[in-house]
Structure formats: structure tokens, C-alpha cells
């Protein structure tokens, strides 16, 4: 990136700054989150036309809602393999169903209450990241696993029990 910046400055190439192509951190503004504002919470996990979605999802955070969670450092190391199950997908209405999150932590319960915008953003990232990771794993399994040996079960979660405390 540094070399690119030097070359652009040296050649005096004009640029326009675009701030709406990518989303990454649900807690901050200034990203492409405005593209999601008109989508109802109950539909945030549904497929929308690509033209209405952020172009890039930067997977640099942990995403959570209810007990649904995805974090790249917590993802099992052999996730892309023949043996590993696929990630269990959250319900399509996850952003209208939950307003808080319980993060997976073996030592203590970490509970977070989320604001209205955060719920929609976390729901979007959670659904679409899990879908993308599963698609990558399925592609690997289809291409590299012997017939009948790949695990296509959607059963991998980060909590042993997916029930929220008020559901117990």
C-alpha cells in the first residue's frame, strides 16, 4: 500500500474517496452501513440484490447476537476440512429476535446489550459471514474429499447450548 501511495503521489493521479463500499465494525459509523438502513431487521439475513449490499465485508471483528457468534480466532483450525461440520446458521430473523448477546467464554458469562443499529449490523455480518465460511468449506469438501467422507452437517456452534437464559 505504501508503494502505491508513493506512485500515486509522484504521478499526481487524482482520486476520489469512497466510504461506503465496505463494512467491518458494527460499532462505528463512516462505513457502508447506510446501505442496510432500509432493510427491515426481520429480513437482514435474506439475500438482497448485490447492488444494494456493501461490496466488501472485512472480517476483522467478532460478530454476535443472541448466542449466535462468529470470530476468526475462535473458529476451529480444521474448519476447512473433510471432517469438520459446517457452521449452524442463525435463523433468518435473528436481528428481530435478539437485542443482546451472550459471548462464548468458558470462564464467565459475557453478556452485551446492543443498540438498535448494532443489532441490525451484527445480524447482517453474522449471517453473511457464516454463509460465506460455509460456502468456502462446502467448496473445499466438494473438491477434495472422497465421496461419502465429507461432513456436511450444519451443527458447529460456539456454545454448547444455544438457548438464551430466558428460554431455560
Which residues are covered by each model-predicted region?
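Detector for methionine-enriched segments
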Residues: 1, 13, 53, 57, ...
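Catalytic core and acceptor-binding pocket of nucleotide-sugar-dependent glycosyltransferases
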Residues: 1-55
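Juxtamembrane luminal stem/stalk of type II transmembrane Golgi/ER carbohydrate-processing enzymes
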Residues: 78-168
Amino acid at each position: 500500500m505504501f508503494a502505491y501511495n508513493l506512485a500515486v503521489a509522484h504521478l499526481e493521479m487524482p482520486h476520489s474517496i469512497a466510504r461506503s463500499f465496505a463494512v467491518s465494525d458494527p460499532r462505528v459509523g463512516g462505513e457502508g452501513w447506510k446501505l442496510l438502513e432500509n432493510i427491515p431487521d426481520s429480513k437482514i439475513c435474506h439475500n438482497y440484490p448485490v447492488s444494494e449490499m456493501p461490496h466488501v465485508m472485512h472480517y476483522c471483528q467478532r460478530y454476535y447476537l443472541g448466542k449466535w457468534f462468529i470470530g476468526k480466532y475462535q473458529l476451529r483450525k480444521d474448519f476447512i476440512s473433510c471432517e469438520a461440520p459446517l457452521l449452524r446458521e442463525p435463523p433468518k430473523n435473528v436481528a428481530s429476535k435478539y437485542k443482546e448477546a451472550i459471548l462464548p467464554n468458558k470462564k464467565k458469562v459475557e453478556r452485551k446489550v446492543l443498540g438498535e443499529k448494532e443489532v441490525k449490523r451484527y445480524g447482517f455480518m453474522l449471517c453473511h459471514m457464516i454463509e460465506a465460511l460455509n460456502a468456502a468449506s462446502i467448496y473445499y469438501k466438494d473438491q477434495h474429499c472422497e465421496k461419502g467422507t465429507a461432513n456436511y452437517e450444519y451443527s458447529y456452534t460456539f456454545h454448547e447450548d444455544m438457548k438464551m437464559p430466558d428460554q431455560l
